[in-house]
């Protein structure tokens, strides 16, 4: 109540921000006459003037009013479009590193040009991130005319580009590209073996289009670069037959023993997207595997040697119980292709991880492709947080504003519409069965068709879109289908979806980024005419005029019929996706309407609200075909959606807390890798490694603070000679000396090792040997980093079970992953030193051969695959952790711990004192915990 009163007096935070921005809009508008009076050349010269002023210390904030005014004037001259005042506000929101929520049709693409132009003045690069290559190329070409006219270079970063083209794209002032490609380029840059092979500059500023889709919908799923691992294809085929021999349990057993409607061997938890074997299921599975000869007599499925079988069995069960053809994937040209859950688009080249994709291939009887080993991985959350400044645009961000603020530190500002919205959102209609629901949908579509009103029908899967298409064919209603199978015609179908009597079926929000204009998209048709070289200029002008007149007539006709009508055939688990569908109607003050038709068979209702709604229908004795249309039911559904959204947010937050641990380690390792790449001479780094290894070896035989009688000098001498090629008579030295300190003996060992090293360098020359050392270090880093990623995956898979032992899984994961990281650095340190000391090189030719061999080993990893998985193992762990523990505070000290360990590898002194608390958070002293590792 008090909050509401304060809002009435002072306005909401959003209203206050808009008020501040409107003051700046007034400044920009005041400059308009001045810039209108400039010639083209004078206006174009402003860009260089701004750059010089920025170089002399003037801030971008100070340049904003003039830069926005210049960009607006240039747009009027080049694009024939003038930025509205609300678009100026949107541009300022983007420049301030916030998220601008702008309704569909309000001109987000043009709005972005303001912030892009201003930030490109710095010369440090601006990345405009889109959801697919088509939009990246379209916007780069479309808005590139404006930027080029203003003297800025524009590049587009596409999947198909080669290395040189990518370098040129990133060197441009402005680079358009997809979120996947930017992320993969970052990972690839950290796999190169020559600094000149990197394509990206330091990450300066990014504007993310459809920011909700990229930073929220896809945030649970990491980008992965992988190479082929061991072949298990036969095992997948054999496991594929097992689910059919097991029976599914209906209902989940509760703590009081109730809840099971029909006993079985496994049950499916649709909420957590998991399959679990029951006790009887374990026994039955063991019998089946025993008969198949996959496990031995008396062996348990949980025996260490059978963990792989468990992994494959669960993959097969999930493939059969949770993933369905034409809903989660399609089979195309003998391959299983994933369907994007949120857009309905086909995701060619992407594969589910952890053996799930191979299990689905076995189920469908297509060729099973080999499993992959992860070479590099990063989540979008951690990639985009590396930019100095990040902002985004979308039509639907307000429902996720808390998550944007919590995870990314991004505030959401709702931008006012240029004209008041006219769309009518009608009450949901809920039917008992799917048949009744589809009958009502067909009636609604027929009514619109007869009145000449265009209809956009949203479905949640390809299967549903094709079912509806068949029903419309039976009803003799002409229509077009837009789903993943028609991806190529997407923009064309959407562009004409606003013509009279047009019926368009779209899977989820396929077609985002293209406006549905009432009467059809005349610009698209005019473009075809202008591109026709057989026509004269006069004929082109005449035909374009005819098209525009025809469009104006159709536009008025559609407006009179009520504008675009949106029909939703099912509620999505996220309100935001539903709002995106609704948002296609009523653009820029046009009329429009929307209604959702639901049935009690829908997944969301079945899981969260079905029993309550069914009870209401039974109590009201609703006749067949009669819907419920009441606010209380709609609110009940929205409450269910909020529950799902809250749970998904918890999963994403948990995922980030887990991934932050490996991210800190990744950043430290990549930082070290880049130092090796860029160093003129890696000699100092190798020397630090060398001294660390020999000191550790020395302390194995001569422990600190011990008596001379406790030293094993003979063993040390033998190990140095046989394992390291360092022949130093330590026993004689000790006998000849009356008394010697351990530190003096250590100095003798280090000097002897240094002499052996210098002898090797002298044989081939310092410069050549430094190149060899660089190759050895990079190979060792990359090989063991890959193994470390696999080890982290294994650790993650079972860590949530620690919750049952009253331990915090995240704290345990942080502690154990840091121990693994310490071992990784220890292994690298020892391996690099051992190779450098034991390699036998007599000449320059032999050194070149050794370097070439390393290069061959590195280039063997050419068969790389790039994946952005639909739902990763890491997300499942986070989900499991959320079930057991709930959300707990983030793991705070992992970065300092990883930094300390990496610093030790580089030979730097850790900042943590030996008696200080260990950064891992265990509560122990550093020397008694991770200090041992460094």
Curated annotation (Swiss-Prot):
Membrane topology term: Peripheral membrane protein
GO terms of molecular function: ATP binding; metal ion binding; protein-exporting ATPase activity
Protein name as catalogued: Protein translocase subunit SecA
Subcellular location: Cell inner membrane; Cytoplasm
Family, similarity comment: Belongs to the SecA family.
Cofactor remark: May bind 1 zinc ion per subunit.
Binding-site list for Zn(2+): 918, 920, 929-930
One Gene Ontology CC term in the entry: cell envelope Sec protein transport complex
Gene: secA
PANTHER family found in the cross-reference section: CHLOROPLAST PROTEIN-TRANSPORTING ATPASE (PTHR30612:SF0), SECA INNER MEMBRANE COMPONENT OF SEC PROTEIN SECRETION SYSTEM (PTHR30612)
Function comment: Part of the Sec protein translocase complex. Interacts with the SecYEG preprotein conducting channel. Has a central role in coupling the hydrolysis of ATP to the transfer of proteins into and across the cell membrane, serving both as a receptor for the preprotein-SecB complex and as an ATP-driven molecular motor driving the stepwise translocation of polypeptide chains across the membrane.
């Amino acid at each position: 109540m008090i909050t509401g009163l304060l809002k009435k007096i002072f306005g909401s935070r959003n209203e206050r921000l808009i008020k501040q921005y409107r003051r700046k809009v007034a400044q920009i508008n005041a400059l308009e006459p001045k810039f209108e009076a400039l010639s083209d050349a004078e206006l174009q010269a402003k860009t260089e003037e701004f750059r010089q002023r920025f170089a002399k210390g003037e801030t971008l904030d100070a340049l904003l009013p003039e830069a926005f005014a210049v960009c607006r004037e240039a747009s009027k001259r080049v694009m024939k479009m003038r930025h509205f005042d609300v678009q100026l506000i949107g541009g300022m929101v983007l420049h301030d590193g916030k998220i601008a929520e702008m309704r569909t049709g309000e001109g987000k693409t043009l709005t972005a040009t303001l912030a892009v132009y201003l930030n490109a003045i710095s010369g440090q690069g601006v990345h405009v991130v889109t959801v697919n290559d088509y939009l990246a190329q379209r916007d780069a070409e479309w808005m590139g005319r404006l930027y080029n006219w203003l003297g800025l270079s524009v590049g587009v970063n596409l999947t198909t580009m080669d290395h040189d083209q990518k370098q040129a794209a990133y060197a441009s002032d402005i680079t358009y590209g997809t979120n996947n490609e930017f992320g993969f380029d970052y990972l690839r840059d950290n796999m190169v073996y020559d600094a000149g092979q990197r394509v990206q500059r330091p990450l300066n500023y990014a504007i993310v289009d459809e920011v909700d889709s990229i930073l929220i919908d896809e945030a649970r799923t990491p980008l992965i670069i992988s190479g082929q691992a061991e072949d298990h294809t036969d095992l997948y085929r054999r496991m594929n037959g097992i689910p059919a021999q097991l029976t599914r349990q209906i209902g989940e057993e509760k703590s009081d023993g109730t809840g099971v409607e029909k006993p079985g061997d496994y049950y499916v938890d649709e909420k957590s997207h998991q399959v679990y074997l029951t006790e009887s299921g374990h026994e039955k599975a063991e019998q089946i595997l025993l008969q198949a000869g996959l496990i031995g007599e008396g062996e348990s499925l949980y025996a260490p040697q059978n963990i792989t079988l468990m992994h494959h069995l669960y993959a097969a069960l999930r493939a059969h119980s949770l993933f369905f053809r034409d809903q989660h994937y399609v089979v195309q040209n003998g391959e299983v292709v994933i369907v994007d859950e949120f857009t309905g688009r086909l995701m060619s080249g992407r594969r589910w991880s952890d053996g799930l994709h191979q299990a689905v291939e076995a189920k469908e009887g297509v060729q099973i492709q080999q499993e992959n080993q992860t070479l590099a991985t990063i989540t979008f959350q951690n990639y985009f947080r590396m930019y100095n400044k990040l902002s985004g645009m979308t039509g639907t961000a307000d429902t996720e504003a808390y998550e944007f603020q919590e995870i990314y530190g991004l505030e959401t500002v709702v931008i006012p519409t240029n004209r008041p919205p006219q769309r009518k959102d009608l009450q949901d209609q809920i039917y008992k069965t799917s048949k009744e629901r589809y009958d009502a949908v067909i009636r609604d579509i027929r009514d619109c068709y007869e009145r000449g009103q265009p209809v956009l029908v949203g479905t949640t899967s390809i299967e549903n879109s094709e079912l509806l298409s068949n029903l419309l064919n039976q009803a003799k209603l002409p229509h077009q289908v837009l789903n993943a199978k028609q991806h190529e015609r997407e923009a064309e179908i959407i562009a004409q979806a606003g013509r009279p009597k047009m019926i368009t079926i779209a899977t989820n929000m396929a077609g985002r980024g293209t406006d549905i204009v009432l009467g059809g998209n005349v610009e698209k048709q005019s473009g075809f005419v202008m591109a026709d070289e057989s026509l004269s200029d006069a004929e082109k002008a005449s035909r374009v005029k005819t098209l525009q007149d025809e469009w104006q007539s159709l536009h008025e006709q559609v407006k009179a019929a009520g504008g675009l009508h949106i029909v939703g055939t099912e509620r999505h688990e996220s309100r935001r996706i539903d709002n995106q569908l609704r948002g296609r109607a009523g653009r820029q003050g046009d009329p429009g309407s929307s209604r959702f038709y639901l049935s009690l068979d829908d997944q969301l209702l079945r899981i969260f609200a079905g029993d309550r709604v069914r009870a209401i229908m039974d109590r009201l004795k609703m006749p067949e075909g009669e819907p419920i249309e009441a606010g209380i039911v709609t609110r009940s559904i929205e409450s269910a959606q909020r529950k799902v959204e809250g749970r998904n947010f918890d999963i994403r937050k948990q995922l980030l807390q887990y991934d932050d641990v490996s991210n800190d380690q990744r950043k430290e390792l990549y930082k070290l890798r880049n130092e090796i790449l860029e160093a003129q001479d890696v000699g100092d780094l190798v020397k630090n490694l060398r001294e660390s290894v020999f000191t550790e070896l020395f302390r194995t035989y001569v422990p600190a603070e011990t008596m001379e009688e406790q030293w094993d000098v003979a063993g040390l001498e033998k190990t140095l000679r046989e394992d390291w090629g360092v022949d130093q008579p330590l026993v004689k030295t000790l006998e000849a000396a009356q008394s010697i300190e351990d530190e003096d003996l250590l100095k003798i060992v280090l000097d002897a090792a240094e002499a052996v090293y210098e002898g090797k360098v002298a044989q081939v020359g310092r410069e050549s040997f430094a190149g060899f050392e660089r190759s050895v270090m990079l190979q060792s880093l990359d090989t063991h980093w890959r193994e470390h990623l696999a080890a982290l995956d294994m650790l993650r898979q079972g860590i949530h079970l620690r919750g049952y032992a009253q331990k915090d899984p995240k704290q345990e994961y942080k502690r154990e992953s840091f121990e693994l990281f310490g071992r990784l650095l220890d292994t690298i340190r020892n391996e690099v030193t051992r190779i450098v000391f034991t390699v036998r090189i007599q000449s320059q030719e032999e050194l070149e051969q050794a370097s070439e061999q390393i290069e061959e080993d590195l280039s063997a990893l050419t068969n790389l695959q790039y994946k952005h998985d639909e739902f990763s193992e890491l997300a499942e762990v986070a989900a499991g952790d959320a079930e057991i523990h709930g959300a707990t505070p983030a793991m705070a000290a992992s970065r300092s711990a990883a930094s300390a360990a990496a610093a030790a590898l580089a030979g730097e002194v850790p900042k943590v004192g030996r008696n200080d608390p260990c950064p891992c958070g265990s509560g122990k002293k550093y020397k008694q915990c991770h200090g041992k590792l460094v």
